[in-house]
Curated annotation (Swiss-Prot):
The lineage of its organism: Bacteria, Pseudomonadati, Pseudomonadota, Betaproteobacteria, Burkholderiales. Digests double-stranded RNA. Involved in the processing of primary rRNA transcript to yield the immediate precursors to the large and small rRNAs (23S and 16S). Processes some mRNAs, and tRNAs when they are encoded in the rRNA operon. Processes pre-crRNA and tracrRNA of type II CRISPR loci if present in the organism. It comes from Delftia acidovorans (strain DSM 14801 / SPH-1). It comes from the Bacteria. The gene is rnc. Homodimer. Its main location: cytoplasm. This is Ribonuclease 3.
Length: 227
């Protein structure tokens, strides 16, 4: 294994049984068809579950809505970007020439996606317990306290709380299209609420941004329907 990847293992505190997973986790789609997008998808779910469990234990008296808001603050792009910098991911990312020249190695969305991909890679390599352990390690330096609930709600959190307040299932987000050059992509995401047979779409320069736009559009639909 290359020395830089071996050093990343040490920072993650996880030794990979399948080193190819680690290599894939730091490979952007602009570099290869064997890239980290599917790992990112998996890691997003592992991250949310691990953080949910952590908050449930640490903030035992906090109501559900506030827990959702704290979690949204913890797993947002800005937090994951800071974790990526601590892991020194800009030195490790494999990007296509165009993406690299356009500053992709410093782009917060790409770095945040790589953190999720690493979590997904650990999960595939050794299971959920190992993935949860790595998540807890990565968030050791992140402040987790009840005051985070006072932060402004983003659209996804607001939509989730609206549905939970009516005992409805959470919305499903799906990337339905990706357009543009690898270094300047636009993502289109569909947000669906099956119980209401509603769907809204949004676009953005990253999956996260597109999900927020789709959630905003869905909130507008709900507002119009329930006005």
């Amino acid at each position: 294994m290359p020395p830089l990847l071996n050093a990343l293992q040490l920072r993650l505190q996880h030794q990979f049984a399948e080193p190819a997973l680690l290599q894939r986790a730091v490979t952007h789609r602009s570099f290869s068809a064997d890239n980290n997008e599917r790992l990112e998808f998996l890691g997003d779910s592992v991250l949310n579950l691990a953080i949910s469990s952590l908050l449930y234990q640490r903030l035992s008296s906090m109501p559900e809505g506030d827990l959702s808001r704290v979690r949204a603050n913890l797993v947002k792009e800005g937090t994951l970007h800071q974790i990526a910098l601590r892991l020194q991911l800009p030195d490790l990312l494999r990007l296509g020439e165009g993406e690299s020249k356009s500053g992709g190695k410093q782009r917060p969305s790409i770095l945040a996606d790589a953190v999720e991909a690493l979590i997904g890679a650990v999960y595939l390599d050794a299971g959920y317990a190992a993935g949860e352990k790595v998540v807890h390690h990565l968030f050791e330096g992140v402040d987790i306290n009840p005051h985070m609930r006072a932060a402004e709600k983003d659209a996804k959190t607001a939509l989730q709380e609206w549905l939970q307040g009516r005992r409805m299932k959470l919305p499903q987000y799906e990337v339905v299209a990706t357009t543009g050059a690898a270094h300047r992509q636009t993502f289109e995401v569909a947000c669906a609420i099956a119980e209401l047979q509603l769907q809204a779409r949004g676009t953005g320069a990253s999956r996260r941004a597109a999900e927020q736009t789709a959630a905003t559009a869905m909130l507008e639909l709900l507002k119009a329907r329930h006005a």
